[in-house]
């Protein structure tokens, strides 16, 4: 039996398929009744291309905002695609595991196997039909972002970068996805030969080894305000990253080419540093590429990435600003820390700024919310 190795990544998984003592022997059965146990280990140090522990300065409050890094998945879903003699998929069975254990009846023969965590209320899964690859995505919640003012960082000003006043951000806004981990084992053979199994405590056990890899990536964004003098006091509307992928094919790892904006909460801990904001955002990454493949990232469709930020002033008004973060996102396709230094004198509060509103349903950064419509098959 050949096990196909995957490139090592942050989350290593060991899958053991076992069941009760099998009678009659395996070779007399058409299916193998098994128990699946998923054991995982998370190593955040190698998930991001830079070490957030040394680059991240914002005083993040885990007890209020949750963890910065990845969490180990607590429940899993297993898709088994049975292959015919022609190598094409003929059947599709799905098994959900409470926690990390469950049972499965698998036909002897070749199968494509897909594992992913299923403990999210935000992630949705769709395919063209029951035998097609599955894409993960999130719902569209707004037709787009509201108008924002372009602002250069101190680094961009030093490089004499010209602010782009003409850019129009014309893309939908989606829910921010939760953490998603996937493992794909194509053309895997379930044998009827007992020699291919271990016999442990009265059970035949099949071990499947591989790496669960993140399919959504974490960016930590910190904004440092120069010449603030208590003018910027918070962000009621939060922020959004533009130009990110709408979803991902969990089999191939390729992100969808459709670009969307992903919103996030923004925090300001004034008792620690009144001149800094911090945010954490998850996304499927750069559209139209495999984020783990440098060549694929380099060949991805060109696009702009803006960090659109709502800032509240001590005058009781607010302003939406946008900062070009294309270079940072493209340099960190699997996530990382982005630090932005901006001068408040470049976007000071003005009499014409709209007043901060606390009205129900009002969002200063995005247009009215809307529900997604479509005809694709949604898999639950």
Model regions: which residues?
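Sec-dependent signal peptide recognition
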Residues: 4-10
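Beta-strand secondary-structure signal
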Residues: 33-39, 112-114, 207-209, 218-222, ...
């Amino acid at each position: 039996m050949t096990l196909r190795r995957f490139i090592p990544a942050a989350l290593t998984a060991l899958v053991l398929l076992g069941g009760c003592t099998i009678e009659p022997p395996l070779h007399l059965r058409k299916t193998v009744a098994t128990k699946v146990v998923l054991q995982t280990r998370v190593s955040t140090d190698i998930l991001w291309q830079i070490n957030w522990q040394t680059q991240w300065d914002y005083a993040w409050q885990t007890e209020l905002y949750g963890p910065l890094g990845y969490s180990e998945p607590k429940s899993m879903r297993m898709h088994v695609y049975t292959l015919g003699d022609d190598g094409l998929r003929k059947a599709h069975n799905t098994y959900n595991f409470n926690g990390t254990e469950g049972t499965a009846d698998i036909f002897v023969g070749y199968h494509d196997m897909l594992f992913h965590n299923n403990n999210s209320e935000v992630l949705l899964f769709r395919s063209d039909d029951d035998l097609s690859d599955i894409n993960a995505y999130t719902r569209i919640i707004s037709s787009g972002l509201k108008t924002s003012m372009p602002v250069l960082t101190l680094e961009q000003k030093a490089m004499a970068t010209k602010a782009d006043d003409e850019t129009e951000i014309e893309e939908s806004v989606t829910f921010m996805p939760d953490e998603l981990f996937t493992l794909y084992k194509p053309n895997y053979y379930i044998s009827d030969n007992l020699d291919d199994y271990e016999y442990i405590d009265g059970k035949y056990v099949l071990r499947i080894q591989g790496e669960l890899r993140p399919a959504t990536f974490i960016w930590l964004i910190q904004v440092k305000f120069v010449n603030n003098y208590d003018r910027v006091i918070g962000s009621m509307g939060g922020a959004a990253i533009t130009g990110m992928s709408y979803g991902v094919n969990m089999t191939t790892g390729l992100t969808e080419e459709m670009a969307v904006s992903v919103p996030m909460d923004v925090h300001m801990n004034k008792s620690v540093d009144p001149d800094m904001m911090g945010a954490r955002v998850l996304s499927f990454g750069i559209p139209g590429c495999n984020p783990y493949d440098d060549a694929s990232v380099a060949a991805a469709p060109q696009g702009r990435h803006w960090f659109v930020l709502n800032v509240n002033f001590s005058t009781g008004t607010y302003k939406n600003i946008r900062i070009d973060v294309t270079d940072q996102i493209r340099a960190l396709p699997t996530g990382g820390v982005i630090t932005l230094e901006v001068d408040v004198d470049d976007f000071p509060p003005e009499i014409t700024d709209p007043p901060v509103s606390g009205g129900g349903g009002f969002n200063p950064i995005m247009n009215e919310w809307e529900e997604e419509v479509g005809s694709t098959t949604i898999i639950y």
